[in-house]
Structures are given as structure tokens and as C-alpha cells.
């Protein structure tokens, strides 16, 4: 009988060591996985804002073709529904009139000249990843109708469709 009680004590100690090893392995995996996941989330948010802002290009083209090159561009604000990833402190409107929820933002349209040059600017804010807050995505239209995208996000978050404009 004494042999069985000694065996139980030895097994109990071994189980505790196993649990400590498992916890250590989980900790190491978490230390590697969490930063990778945060990078993935930030990259997906950049892609989302590029798409949401780029979707407004059609409305801008319609306005250019119809000669609506107003400075305020309220007739040409497109059909943006707002985004929880964009800053809502600037032009917090959609179609120039409908207010966007305070936790939402919309791209800002500006006609640079009367020749059809324009910019669509989205500023990250609200629920965007902290490393993106304050960064911008800018779609620029030249007078020939060619659109180019530039951003100031860190190089590791950039997307092929919208390269960073700096060497960060």
C-alpha cells in the first residue's frame, strides 16, 4: 500500500511540471502570434479604407462629366455610407447633407481646379488600429482622368494598390 501512495505523489508532481511546460509553450506562441495578428488586422483595415474611398471615384467621374466642379463638391460627395475606420472630425457628411454618426467618417472630396483634378482623402480614426490613427489614404485624379493612390501608412501596412508616399 505504501508503494501506491508514493506513486500517486510522484505522478502528481509530474503533472504539475507538465502543466507548467504547457503554459510556457502557450505564452511563447502568444508572444509570437499576437503581434502578427495585429499587423494582419492593420493591413486589412488599410485595404478596406482604400476600397471604401476608391468606390467614390465613380461619383467624381460623373460630376466631372456633368461639369459639376464646385469648390464645396456637395453635389459630388458620392454615395459613401461612412466607415468606422475613418476619422469623423472633418467633413462628417455624406452627399454633402446627411450627417454621419459621430463614430463614423467619410472620405473628403476636393476639386483642385476646374480641369477635373480632384482628391478623395480618407483619414484613419475612430476604431482603426492605433498604428493607423491619423494616417491618410489619398486618391488623386489628374486632368486626363487617371487616378493614383498614395498613403502615409508604414511600409509594412501598405497595399499594392496604394503604395506609401514616404520611405517609412
Functional labels for PLM-detected ranges:
Residues 20-36:
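Alpha-helical hydrophobic helix detector
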Residues 42-72, 78:
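Membrane-proximal N-terminal amphipathic helix
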Residues 2-5, 61, 165-168:
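Short, intrinsically disordered N-terminal pre-domain segments
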Residues 65-168:
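Periplasmic/extracellular, small/polar-rich flexible segments of pilin-like filament-forming proteins
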Residues 3, 28, 52:
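Conserved helix-loop functional segments at active or binding sites
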Amino acid at each position: 500500500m505504501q508503494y501506491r501512495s508514493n506513486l500517486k505523489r510522484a505522478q502528481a508532481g509530474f503533472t504539475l511540471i507538465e502543466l507548467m511546460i504547457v503554459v510556457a509553450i502557450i505564452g511563447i506562441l502568444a508572444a509570437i502570434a499576437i503581434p502578427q495578428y495585429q499587423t494582419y488586422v492593420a493591413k486589412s483595415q488599410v485595404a478596406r479604407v482604400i476600397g471604401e474611398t476608391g468606390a467614390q471615384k465613380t461619383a467624381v467621374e460623373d460630376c466631372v462629366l456633368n461639369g459639376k466642379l464646385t469648390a464645396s463638391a456637395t453635389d459630388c460627395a458620392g454615395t459613401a455610407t461612412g466607415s468606422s475606420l475613418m476619422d469623423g472630425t472633418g467633413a462628417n457628411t455624406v452627399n454633402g447633407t446627411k450627417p454621419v454618426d459621430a463614430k463614423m467618417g467619410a472620405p473628403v472630396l476636393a476639386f483642385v481646379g476646374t480641369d477635373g483634378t480632384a482628391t478623395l482623402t480618407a483619414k484613419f480614426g475612430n476604431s482603426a488600429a492605433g498604428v493607423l490613427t491619423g494616417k491618410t489614404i489619398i486618391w488623386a485624379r489628374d486632368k486626363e482622368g487617371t487616378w493614383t493612390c498614395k498613403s502615409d501608412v508604414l511600409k509594412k501596412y501598405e497595399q499594392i494598390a496604394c503604395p506609401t508616399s514616404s520611405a517609412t
